[in-house]
From Swiss-Prot:
Listed CDD domains: YihA_EngB (cd01876)
Keywords: Cell cycle, Cell division, GTP-binding, Magnesium, Metal-binding, Nucleotide-binding, Septation
Gene3D superfamilies for the chain: P-loop containing nucleotide triphosphate hydrolases
Stored PROSITE patterns: G_ENGB (PS51706)
Protein name: Probable GTP-binding protein EngB
Cofactor dependency: Mg(2+)
Gene name linked to the record: engB
Lineage of origin: Bacteria, Bacillati, Bacillota, Bacilli, Bacillales
Gene Ontology CC annotation, any one: cytosol
Origin species: Listeria innocua serovar 6a (strain ATCC BAA-680 / CLIP 11262)
Its biological purpose: Necessary for normal cell division and for the maintenance of normal septation.
Gene Ontology biological process terms from the UniProt entry: division septum assembly
Length: 194
């Protein structure tokens, strides 16, 4: 998709704050500091629309980015971040679960994992949660440019096995540096919009 117009419409914490629109939505889920903001910025060809932070746990709301008046990316808080209180993490969990299980406009979830590392228990639980609720999901393994190409398949296999990955789902190696995987991710999104 050729992207020229992007707007952060709202940062929401409750359903009544969600945009009132019929546009399809794609949520981005992943551990804190896994590269969600870099993924968004690469997909929409912007350097800093989604703020990139060295400090994990920066996103604390559901951030609705309207793209080309055609769809929304919804950046959700990163899971598995230890430096926020347990109460805060539980609030985020409820907020994310409420959105994913009740939002009619949600067409799919882009689950972001780091190709360099074995997925965590939180990654596995998120994938399992999405499968349980029959939510279309694509797993995007980011930071492929940070490891030698010779390790891509080995690391991808570890990610798939750890998640108990469904071969019917889409799995994409991604790099915000080289833009590898960008077209495949857009293809998943376009298919869900048809």
């Amino acid at each position: 998709m050729d992207v020229n117009n992007v707007e952060l419409v709202i940062s929401a914490v409750r359903p009544e704050q969600y945009p009132e629109t019929d546009l399809p939505e794609y949520a981005l889920a992943g551990r804190s500091n896994v590269g969600k903001s870099s993924f968004i910025n690469t997909m929409i060809r912007r350097k800093s629309m989604a703020r990139i932070s060295q400090k994990p746990g920066k996103t604390q709301t559901l951030n609705f980015y309207k793209i080309e008046e055609a769809l929304f990316f919804v950046d959700v808080p990163g899971y598995g971040f230890a430096k926020v209180s347990k109460t805060e993490r539980e609030k985020w969990g409820v907020m994310i679960e409420t959105y994913i299980t009740s939002r009619e406009q949600l067409r799919g979830v882009i689950q972001i994992v780091d190709l360099r590392h074995k997925p965590t228990e939180d990654d596995r639980m998120m994938y399992e949660f999405l499968k349980y609720y029959d939510i279309p999901v694509i797993v995007v393994a980011t930071k492929a440019d940070k490891i030698p190409r010779s390790k891509w398949q080995k690391n991808a296999k570890i990610v798939r096995e750890t998640l108990d990955f469904d071969p019917d789902d889409k799995f994409v190696l991604f790099s915000s540096e080289t833009k590898m995987g960008k077209d495949e991710a857009w293809q998943f999104i376009k298919e869900g919009m048809e």
